[in-house]
Amino acid sequence: MRAFLKYFVVSTILCLVPGVALADNNPPPNTCTAVSFPAPQGGTLAATLCMPSTPTSTIMVLMAGSNYNHTYWDFPYAPETYNFRRAMNAAGYATLVVDRLGTGASTRPPSATLTATGSVLALHQIVGAVRQGLPGAQPFAKIITGGHSLSSGVAVIEASTHHDVDGVLLTGFSHSLDTAGTLAVVATYHSAAEDPQFAGQGLDAGYLTTKPGTRAADFYGAGDYDPGVLATDEATKEVFSLTEYPDGLTSTQPPETNLIDVPVLIVDGSADKLCLNACASTATLAAEEAPYFCPAARLRTFVLPGSGHSVNLARNTAAYQAAVRDWLAAMF
């Protein structure tokens, strides 16, 4: 860990980002710092640390899934509604939003070298660094990892293997995979090198992305999106590699989630085409998922009505943000 921290790099430039008010329309600004970590496989992982306006000992380490980068958690369009990071900062929690290797501002290695196992190791090392204290921030006593889809699988494996976090937020995750819906999404993938958005970037053929104009059907409930959100989502779409999927999917195989011994919140959309029957309601999801978790997980669930796979970007995402705040307040 000392070697890891030795190479930890933090930028010297701080950016002030307006917070999202819960009651005050002009809250103090949040302080955000660009940071980077060495990736276990080589290269660097880019991240942004944001502190709330009041002192806190709790931090959420957030990583996006495939098809997304940091913008999923730190959404630039109508941030007062859709920016999850800002909502958590406004609630008094620190956040560290991390780009997976191969995405965002992180290093892009050959696509075949990307795996969920590599992301698990990276997340584990980041958690250790956060626990000891990042430059410009005190050590955090409580660390909650948060994932979406693929990175929820990463968070599961990290927590069940290393037992070094205090809570786990899983979104776009369940043990009820809709095979037909999943295959329909996969059918919209194509080589990023063939996509106008990534042409000329020198990406190898293994890097994939969604075909233009397919994200509404893939990740949203029918009509459950602001046109500006969808346009921003298409404009900020990300690449990924199918080599990240096989070991990522082991997170849904017994006994993986049963080994998590800290509080867990699962959030899904009722119209998520990747989820079969479990996502019909909060109660249904709780009943379906309960056998896969031990009592120490104190499992909570929340289903966002009408939302597709990307709950951060649904019209009613504020209800999901409120559910997360309630869970954090109750458990930590």
Give the ranges of each region predicted by the language model.
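Glycine-rich "HGGG/HGxG" loop immediately N-terminal to the catalytic nucleophile
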Residues: 71, 98-114, 309-310
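Conserved loop-alpha-helix segment in the C-terminal half of the alpha/beta-hydrolase fold
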Residues: 270-304
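Catalytic active-site module of serine/aspartate enzymes centered on a nucleophile-bearing elbow/loop
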Residues: 297-332
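Conserved hydrolase catalytic core segment
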Residues: 141-177
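Short, surface-exposed "cap/lid" segments of acyl-processing enzymes
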Residues: 54-93
